[in-house]
Swiss-Prot record:
Name of the protein in question: Transcription termination factor 5, mitochondrial
Gene Ontology cellular component list: mitochondrial matrix; mitochondrion
GO biological process, one term: regulation of DNA-templated transcription
UniProt KW Transcription regulation keyword: yes
Isomerase as UniProt keyword: no
Function in brief: Binds promoter DNA and regulates initiation of transcription. Regulates mitochondrial replication and transcription. Required for normal topology and maintenance of mitochondrial DNA (mtDNA) levels. Regulates mtDNA replication by re-activating replication after replication pausing. Likely to regulate replication pausing by coordinating with the mitochondrial termination factor mTTF which promotes replication pausing.
Assembly and interaction partners: Probably binds to the mTTF-DNA complex.
Chain segments carrying region Disordered: 23-47
Organism (species): Drosophila melanogaster
Cellular compartments annotated: Mitochondrion
Amino acid sequence: MLRNGQNQAQLLARSLGQLARGMASSKRVSSKKEDLKPKLPKPPTVEIPMEEPLNASYLSKTLGSSYRSWAAALEKHPELKTLKRKDLLSSYDTLKSLDYSVDDIIAKPMIIYYGATTLANRHSVLQECGFHNVTVQTLAKYVTVVNKPIEVLKAHNYIPFDVKVAERLAGYFKDIKLPVDLRELESETLTLKSLRQSLINAYLRERLQMDDNDLQKLWRVYTRIRHKSFRAVQDTIELLTKEFNFSAERLRKNSFLLYSEADNVRRILREVPTIDSQDIREIGFRRPKILMSTCDSLKQTLQHVHAFGISEDAVLRCLEVLTLGPDTVLERLRDLQEIEEFQVLGTNPRILRLVHYQNKARLRLDYLNQLRVRCASLHILSCGSEAFAKFARDGSDRTKGRDIVVYLSNVLGKDVQVLRNLLSRHPNWCHIPLLHVKQCLEYLRSKKFKLNEIFANIHLLLYPIKRIEEKMLLLQSPDAQEDLQLPVANFDSLSNNEILTLILYLIESEFHFTGDGIWTEQHTHHVENFNNLLPDFPESLNKVYKYGVKPAEKMIMERL
């Protein structure tokens, strides 16, 4: 249909004749019932709860102590007011489990500003080093303390004089012989920080076969590992190797996992055992960064995804979304409904790529709009920087049609390949933006055309709504009915299917059945002239990581 002008004109004329004969003999009776087809999910009313800043009244009622004490603490440390209540309660529960009272916390109120995991780790480190009484004051000064020489800590009675710190720390490494001479580490002029780092280096050399380069990167990039207890590091490595089948090499390449919490990972195994029937162990192995998210965050993120009618299969197509915070995911899911070009992709199985890359996608969409590029596919909005730069420079205002066929498959309930085969009969179908297809379909639905009737005339979705309206009005005029020699008394005698077929015929007859009827006046021969209209690609793309182009890719940009 519409491939070659003259041949297609003959085909359409023949079809019109058959249509007329069919109308003369009998009128097709429309079905009373129409199968319900899935539509784009409506935005659910999921809101991020708004919290009031922490105040003395809430703290005194929730944690205890007097209103006056907390008021004084908040006045002295106003940054405490920015703490989220769930984080506050989590830190308080940890401090409580470590036998600190509310009065202890009031004495050093900023202690509760630290995260629960940080507090637990630091307390464990000090215990491993031989501190016989870890007070809340000591815990609050943790960074200062571990940077002190061991002899100074013993002189101030933090560590008993008879404790051999190096030997004590080495003893926490079980079932492994450290490749280090402890006699070289017995000097009490060493700081706790340097002693612990020497021992953890020896352990990682033996357990994960890390070399000097691996260790240098570890301490340069993932410095927080030095604040994790030896027992916790070993527990994490054993869990990852046994439950997730991580090899030593894979752990070296993803050394940030050494800071993951073993107890949290165990919770994930128990409470999120599968995603769309796929074992969480396989998922964690594929995307190790997911294991750095808390179990509660993963569960909440999945709840938000479900609330917006997005399947878990979509999660598997973009596992990176699980590395975002749940509040961020919820906010971005809601934002999808605010931008028409994003909202129309709501049923696309790769929709979560727009959630993960939303900031980049917004910038790219704005930039392409400035270039008057209408066909911005989900892939182009979320692909790598090099691919996007090439697309923008080439100036080809077209897609491969995947977004269109996926959308129509969800709405019409038809096979993707069937739709592609039908649409590909039109030479220009890939030059039509998905948003227009959606708007045209909604327009036809508003005129009471059924989905099966639209499917039978699917190419009409590619045409400007204004032209469809014009031809629909034209068909209602007696002159047009006479010119077309329709064997019916009036317009109302035509079936919906016949009306759509005639509209398509009338539009393309003006363009000699070449398929050019899809272009509006603003976009006539848009593709052919696009390269002449394309402005210079902005230099900012080579300097600032904007629209997805990193500074390191400047040479690539120059070659494009």
